[in-house]
Amino acid sequence: MDAELAALIWLTIEGGIPLVVAGGAGEERLVVRDALLALVPVGASVMRLAGDREDFAWMPQAGELGWRSTAPSRPMQPGKPGAVMVAALEDREGGTWGEAAHLAIRALTAGYSLIATASGATLQDVLGHLSRPPVSAIDDELARLGVVLLLGDGPRVSVAHYLRPAARDPGGHVQRPAPAALATWSAKTSRYDHFAWGLVAELAGRIGGRPIAFEREQARRASVIAGATRA
């Protein structure tokens, strides 16, 4: 990704917006996901989900969110809302799948964040895999997945999508805005086309900031990244 997109991703991860890496090969997704963990703020609580052995004993809200644990209770340091879950939401060895994947997605409504991988070459594929059994996440839950990066060749991010959670308008009506593209890679020009400018107010509001401050900070970080790349 270029400096502008990298700065945007940095800001969203730091602000607690979830992120999913899809597309590409399975190992490529894991490499990109783990590299992005370096952008999690220092001191943040990071909880790596244990695949098919995950029992969410660390999550106080698990029962309220519908988790039915069959494991004996055991003392653990509880995770805090705002903790970043790290997972592979995939039906693969070491992956978190089925009811556990659904619980991880549902936990986003309780203030947790997520950096994960998922299978699927397109956004529709990703959402389709997670909406069908055995995960069975509903649309309003999937809309909280935040940023979805689709890998192409390289692995390069070919498209960065933003999933927008349902919200109420001033009249109290529930609005479910469609996903939006943050950036797309153009093979013709060998550069990214950026569209996040149309979502600045929404992104800034989601992380608790002002649009002008968000734009300035993104530009500052992009400059830092570009300078480091040239060095």
Predicted regions, residues:
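ATP-binding Walker
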Residues: 15, 26-27
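Conserved P-loop NTPase
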Residues: 146-228
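P-loop NTP-binding catalytic core
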Residues: 1-18, 38
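General structural feature for long, well-ordered alpha-helical segments within catalytic domains
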Residues: 5, 28-32, 100
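Switch/coupling sub-region of P-loop NTPases
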Residues: 17-23, 33, 37-153
